Amino acid sequence: MADIKNYTLNFGPQHPAAHGVLRLVLELDGEVIQRADPHIGLLHRATEKLAEQKTWIQSVPYMDRLDYVSMMVNEHAYVMAIERLLGLEVPIRAQYIRVMFDEITRLLNHLMWIGSHALDVGAMAVFLYAFREREDMFDMYEAVSGARMHAAYYRPGGVYRDLPDTMPQYRASKVHNEKAIKVMNEARSGSLLDFIEDFTNRFPTYVDEYETLLTDNRIWKQRLVDIGVVTPERALQMGFTGPMLRGSGIEWDLRKKQPYEVYDKMDFDIPVGTAGDCYSRYLVRVEEMRQSNRIIKQCIDWLRRNPGPVITENHKVAPPSRVDMKSNMEELIHHFKLFTEGIHVPAGEAYAAVEHPKGEFGIYAISDGANKPYRLKIRAPGFVHLAALDEMARGHMIADAVTIIGTQDIVFGEIDR
């Protein structure tokens, strides 16, 4: 009698649930996965090599394009590595602004995750809800940097500029008349901090809406509970970080365990899962959204009370103000040297890691004393998680592979780099 061979199926790279350009070669016994082999590299853009040909400051926009859903957090790790090499002190106001925008970015990421994860599993409404909130947060990005996504707002020594006192206003168009525009601009009459505060007051009710739609939903639980289970020991052995590790019951968060910037002054909790399955990771991320909202509120209160500089006064690292540059020859020279030659970073090496929405995102920078990095290594959290896909998917159905890819929160910009 002939042997029955396993069936090989190509999943992706142009599959709607593949989260970008994932190609999975699945070995199937009927509908059960025997082996899942991820093929990566389809979004490789040689970021680490490109950084070696650019000055230290010119590489900041490349960081936005790594995990293109969590833009400012990527920048944060990079500028922290430069600051460690330079031994720079960042003004306290800039630290609070960075922490606030890190958490806004965490919300952006988790909303994208919950929307696309639910859409993959078959719940479309949450996707539309999540993008309604993301629109407000893109406006926050736009107010400080001029860009909705790729902000390039963090700079070595601080941030590009202080928070604006006014918000961009909508104008009447063919789509929206004067009456509609008046309603849309209601929350935009004050400063950016007023706009963010208004959003943080509304946001908990939005999270309640997502939970109403999903948390006790029978179909959602059937698709997530006991799928992709990872034990705490295995999660550590495979190098998991972030919600993937906390979902397995290990309380590890760089914001608490190795605090950077002003996280040690913040009051927040670390949500931890119990079962290590997709449902536990879902609950962890939903609670993380609530905790991020708490941190943003604390930052708003502090920033209202404490004006001050937002970037270092050292003009060999940060450009002088435009007013000074146009009236003072020395400042003009500083400006010219900074944007032509860049910063000469002392020889040495530094590793800076941040608690990225997906896990531990690290930048290992080596300087040989020149104005460009000698070597830049990017530690992407998603790379480790994708490597565990085979183990997590084995023995499950094809439909469950989609759920597992969703729970890993994979973005290929950072994996392929």
UniProtKB/Swiss-Prot annotation:
Keyword Hydrolase: no
Keyword flag Translocase: yes
Highest taxon of the lineage: Bacteria
Subcellular location: Cell inner membrane
Enzyme nomenclature, EC number: 7.1.1.-
Alphabetic keyword roster: Cell inner membrane, Cell membrane, Membrane, NAD, Quinone, Translocase, Transport, Ubiquinone
InterPro entries tied to this protein: NADH_Q_OxRdtase_suD, NADH_UbQ_OxRdtase_49kDa_CS, NDH1_su_D/H, NiFe-Hase_large
Any single Pfam family the record assigns to this protein: Complex1_49kDa
Listed SUPFAM superfamilies: HydB/Nqo4-like
One GO location term (cellular component): plasma membrane
Catalytic reactions of this protein: a quinone + NADH + 5 H(+)(in) = a quinol + NAD(+) + 4 H(+)(out)
Bilayer topology term: Peripheral membrane protein
Major localization class: membrane
An MF annotation (GO) of this entry: quinone binding
Top-rank EC class of the record's enzyme: translocase
Family to which this protein belongs: Belongs to the complex I 49 kDa subunit family.
Subunit details: NDH-1 is composed of 14 different subunits. Subunits NuoB, C, D, E, F, and G constitute the peripheral sector of the complex.
Cited function: NDH-1 shuttles electrons from NADH, via FMN and iron-sulfur (Fe-S) centers, to quinones in the respiratory chain. The immediate electron acceptor for the enzyme in this species is believed to be ubiquinone. Couples the redox reaction to proton translocation (for every two electrons transferred, four hydrogen ions are translocated across the cytoplasmic membrane), and thus conserves the redox energy in a proton gradient.
The protein's name in its UniProt record: NADH-quinone oxidoreductase subunit D
Source species taxonomy: Bacteria, Pseudomonadati, Pseudomonadota, Betaproteobacteria, Burkholderiales
Gene from which this protein is expressed: nuoD
